[in-house]
Amino acid sequence: MAMVLSAIIGSLVLALSGCSDQSGKTEKTLRVGVITYSQDDPFINALTDELKAYLKTMESEERRIIVSIKSGNDDQQEQNEKVEEMIDAGCDVLCVNLVDRTAPYRIIRMARNENIPVIFFNREPVKE
């Protein structure tokens, strides 16, 4: 799971870094927002630590990667608010581990309105 998520994020990093104006020595900053369902899950904590470490290896002189990790604390409404905070903070990509697998619609709508890619991991969205 960590390798798949890392590969997807890596692809997005490369794709999004191609979107910047690279005239001169301008450093591109890529902001990755990771929102988990709970901060009490050891597997999710290990996964997010691995993702953060992997993204650190992808940094270069031209590309800086900032990873912000927040928890929904087992509450879908709180997770939606955290996603909105990440969008307002300027995240370029969101990685979401849903609290409620049947409630991804608000997150998708918020991200789509800002043209931000969303990766759902470990908990696949499902219909009610």
Show which residues each predicted segment covers.
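Short helix-terminating capping/connector loops at secondary-structure junctions
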Residues: 26-27, 61-65
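Extracytoplasmic "Venus flytrap"
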Residues: 31-54, 58, 68-84, 89-91, ...
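Structural signature of beta-strand start/N-cap positions in the alpha/beta core
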Residues: 92-93, 117
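Flexible loop/hinge segments that line or gate small-molecule binding clefts
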Residues: 101-128
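A generic local structural motif
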Residues: 19, 80-81, 106
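Helix C-cap/helix->beta junction micro-motif
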Residues: 58, 62, 114-116
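Short, low-complexity disordered leader/linker segments with a strong preference
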Residues: 1-30, 87, 109-116
